[in-house]
Structure formats: C-alpha cells, structure tokens
Amino acid sequence: LGVGHLIRWVEADVAVTAPDPHEYDLALGAYLQLPAGQLGTAVRAAAAALRPGGLLVVVGHHVDNLTAGVGGPQDAAVLFTPEEVTDHLASTDLVLERAETVRRPVPDVTRNAIDALVTARRPMGLRA
C-alpha cells in the first residue's frame, strides 16, 4: 500500500537535455558543481520543469568551502553562493523560500563543510 507507484523518478542532465515543462513536483540539483554559465542553464531548466506548487532545491559546495571548509571540488570556478543561484532564478516566476550558507559537520574532521542551499517554489495557479 505505498505510494511508490505514484512516483516517476527521472535522472537526467538538465545542462544537456531540458526536462518537459511544468511536469514535476520536485527538481533537485544536489552538488551540481558546474561553471556559472552551465549552472545557470541547469537551474533555469529545472525551474521551468516545475508544475504550480513545485519545489526547486539546489544544494552544493559553497565557494567559501575552498578556503574555510573541507572536502568538495578544489576549483573555485565550479563553487557557488546562494546569491549566484538566486540570480539565475531572477528571470523565473519562482518564489524564493530559502537562500543561505549552511555549515555541515564532516565525520573525523575538525572543520565543517560549507554548502550553498536554495529552495524556491512555483506559485500555485501559474504555468509560465
């Protein structure tokens, strides 16, 4: 009696193939460490894929992680801030819910990892 049969999982590279517009309740970009232009393309494509009420979640290694955190890519060109993600969303109709820097404990390490986290939602009743 689960809901698994109601879920359609899609694993795809939104930087290469745009998902169908207005089809998804959730778009997740987890540790999508791309150069700024490619990240913007991927974030906007994921945003366009959301139905009304749909949620976009973007989480990845923050640029500060390079000098003050631990782990993650050691290339500043693929690290980002929450503000950079929200700038990519400025041309969309998504409503920002959360945009912040998050410190994440890492086992057996004295420093935290530093992540950028953004959540935004397409308003109900909107299809563009």
Which residue ranges define each predicted feature?
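Conserved SAM-binding strand-loop segment of SAM-dependent methyltransferases
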Residues: 2-15
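Short "lid" loop at the C-terminus of a central beta-strand within the Rossmann-like core
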Residues: 16, 33-34, 60-66, 104
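A short SAM/SAH-binding and catalytic strip from SAM-dependent methyltransferases
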Residues: 24-39
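A short glycine-rich, Lys/Arg-flanked "PGG" loop and its adjoining helix->strand segment in the class I
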Residues: 40-52
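Core SAM-dependent methyltransferase catalytic element
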Residues: 105-128
